[in-house]
């Protein structure tokens, strides 16, 4: 597979990632920050099932710091998702480079405390986490595996935008 074909495969991966992120954000993540009445009971039940099944304490009883991340997802990331979906599925949209770098760095930065919480938090002593929470290493790793793509794909995006010769910035100068 040549360089253009490889680039298109990565662009398709990124386009599908951003497309899939729209319903996940709207119907799951934002339930923690938007009024309950906006969501049909089916979506509320889906979130309850997920949080119980995967013992996700952040979506059962979201702490303030996590809600701040979700607010950023609502205000900054959600409007970017359709733009990025278009750019990557269409392909060859060099203008997406800077916004994609900003998105990837922002998203990876928010995932570090989330994944660290899942890995290192002593939930038995943490008063801020009620409800079910991961107790065993296996439960913690399962929960991390749910969130890990939201760290790994932005990392791939960042490397792709920084290293791809196609997306590198070239200064255009007027000829005299």
Curated annotation (Swiss-Prot):
Localization annotation: Rough endoplasmic reticulum membrane; Nucleus membrane
Report the residue ranges where the short sequence motif ER retention motif is annotated in this entry: 172-176
Q: Name one GO biological process term.
A: positive regulation of wound healing
User: At which residues is there a site annotated Important for 20(S)-OHC binding and stereoselectivity?
Assistant: 150
The regions listed as transmembrane in this protein's record are: 10-30, 69-89, 100-120, 141-161
Alphabetically, the GO molecular function entries are: cholesterol binding; oxysterol binding
Q: Where is this site: Likely important for receptor folding?
A: 56
**Cysteines paired by S-S bonds:** none
Lumenal topological domain residue ranges? 31-68, 121-140
Q: Could you tell me the keywords of this UniProt record?
A: Endoplasmic reticulum, Membrane, Nucleus, Transmembrane, Transmembrane helix
Q: Which residue ranges does the record assign to the EXPERA domain? A: 10-158
Q: Signal peptide position in this chain?
A: none
The domain comment in this protein's record states: The EXPERA domain doesn't possess any sterol isomerase catalytic activity. The four transmembrane helices are all kinked owing to the presence of proline residues in each, creating a ligand-binding cavity near the center of the protein.
Question: What function does the entry list?
Answer: Sigma-2 receptor which contributes to ameliorate dysfunctional cellular processes and slow degenerative progression by regulating cell functions including cholesterol biosynthesis/trafficking, membrane trafficking, autophagy, lipid membrane-bound protein trafficking, and receptor stabilization at the cell surface. Forms a ternary complex with PGRMC1 receptor and low density lipoprotein receptor/LDLR at the plasma membrane, which increases LDLR-mediated LDL cholesterol internalization.
More info: Sigma receptors are classified into two subtypes (Sigma-1 and Sigma-2) based on their different pharmacological profile. Sigma-2 receptors are identified by radioligand-binding studies as a binding site with high affinity for di-o-tolylguanidine (DTG) and haloperidol.
Name recorded for this polypeptide: Sigma intracellular receptor 2
Lineage, opening ranks:
Eukaryota, Metazoa, Chordata, Craniata, Vertebrata
Name the gene.
Tmem97
